[in-house]
């Protein structure tokens, strides 16, 4: 097996937008990583229904197709 062909696998501190932080291991190459959603705030794990909107896509969709009548 060839040596030194695999990326470095180091500890990374992950910070969610909700404020939750945890340490994991990754090949990302950074010491810190920011994410938008984690298991502490994801609707599937919390049981709360909410729309997870990235960059206003839901609002854009509603603006574009909200006035249409049902078929």
From Swiss-Prot:
Pfam families: Ribosomal_L31. Zn(2+) binds at residues 16, 18, 38, 41. Binds 1 zinc ion per subunit. Its cofactor is Zn(2+). Gene3D superfamilies: Ribosomal protein L31. GO terms for biological process: translation. GO terms for cellular component: ribonucleoprotein complex; ribosome. InterPro entries: Ribosomal_bL28/bL31-like_sf, Ribosomal_bL31, Ribosomal_bL31_A, Ribosomal_bL31_sf. Signal peptide: none annotated. The keyword Thylakoid does not apply. Keywords: Metal-binding, Ribonucleoprotein, Ribosomal protein, RNA-binding, rRNA-binding, Zinc. One of its GO terms (molecular function) is structural constituent of ribosome. Belongs to the bacterial ribosomal protein bL31 family. Type A subfamily. Binds the 23S rRNA. Part of the 50S ribosomal subunit. This is Large ribosomal subunit protein bL31. It comes from Francisella tularensis subsp. novicida (strain U112).
């Amino acid at each position: 097996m060839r040596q030194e062909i695999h990326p470095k696998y180091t500890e990374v501190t992950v910070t969610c937008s909700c404020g939750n932080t945890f340490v994991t291991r990754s090949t990302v190459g950074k010491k810190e990583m920011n994410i938008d959603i984690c298991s502490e705030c994801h609707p599937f794990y919390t049981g709360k229904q909410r729309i997870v909107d990235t960059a206003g896509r839901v609002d854009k969709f509603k603006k574009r197709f909200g006035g249409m009548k049902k078929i």
